[in-house]
Amino acid sequence: MAEIPEGANVTILNRNEKKARELISKLGLKKVPGIIRVTFRKKDNQIFAIEKPEVFRSVGGNYVVFGEAKVDNFTQRLAAAQQQAQSQTATKTPEDIQADMQAAAVANENKTEGDAAEEDVDAGDLSNDDIDLVVQQTNATKGQAIKALKEHNGDIVNAIMSLSK
């Protein structure tokens, strides 16, 4: 018997799986590369997951999946993620929290100064109703609404669309 080198990836197939693979090769199924995980969901939201599956596809669009199916407990993974997020926020010191709050306040002040500069835009021949409509629909500032209306020659729809992007 030949020796298997260290670090080699060896898969031992049972008898039923060997037979199934032989039948698949006779049916002409094509192997689908690049699939990392397959999940199946039942009506009661129970999830079965197959990690590193071998997936084959028939001409008609049906799939055959080989691999070890495990019951995936989504609630446990969600609880672990929440616990990890809480531990990350708990590690902040009061000084870090104060620094974050001051940085947010400075950013907010800079934003309001920029908004005040935009308010000085000349409305020209645009009606206040058109400007107010664009502001209401897009939650933009009055200056942004006037600028968009001028860019689109007073077309309200195009101004709203440009600000909604």
Swiss-Prot record:
This is Nascent polypeptide-associated complex subunit alpha. One of its GO terms (biological process) is protein transport. It is found in: Cytoplasm; Nucleus. Pfam families: NAC (PF01849), UBA_HYPK (PF19026). Gene3D superfamilies: DNA helicase RuvA subunit, C-terminal domain, Nascent polypeptide-associated complex domain. PROSITE patterns: NAC_AB. Signal peptide: none annotated. InterPro entries: EGD2/NACA0like, NAC-like_UBA, NAC_A/B_dom_sf, Nas_poly-pep-assoc_cplx_dom, UBA-like_sf. Belongs to the NAC-alpha family. Transmembrane segments: none annotated. PANTHER family: NASCENT POLYPEPTIDE ASSOCIATED COMPLEX ALPHA SUBUNIT-RELATED. Part of the nascent polypeptide-associated complex (NAC), consisting of EGD2 and EGD1. NAC associates with ribosomes via EGD1. GO terms for cellular component: extracellular region; fungal biofilm matrix; nascent polypeptide-associated complex; nucleus. Component of the nascent polypeptide-associated complex (NAC), a dynamic component of the ribosomal exit tunnel, protecting the emerging polypeptides from interaction with other cytoplasmic proteins to ensure appropriate nascent protein targeting. The NAC complex also promotes mitochondrial protein import by enhancing productive ribosome interactions with the outer mitochondrial membrane and blocks the inappropriate interaction of ribosomes translating non-secretory nascent polypeptides with translocation sites in the membrane of the endoplasmic reticulum. Residues 126-165 form the UBA domain. It comes from Candida glabrata (strain ATCC 2001 / BCRC 20586 / JCM 3761 / NBRC 0622 / NRRL Y-65 / CBS 138) (Yeast).
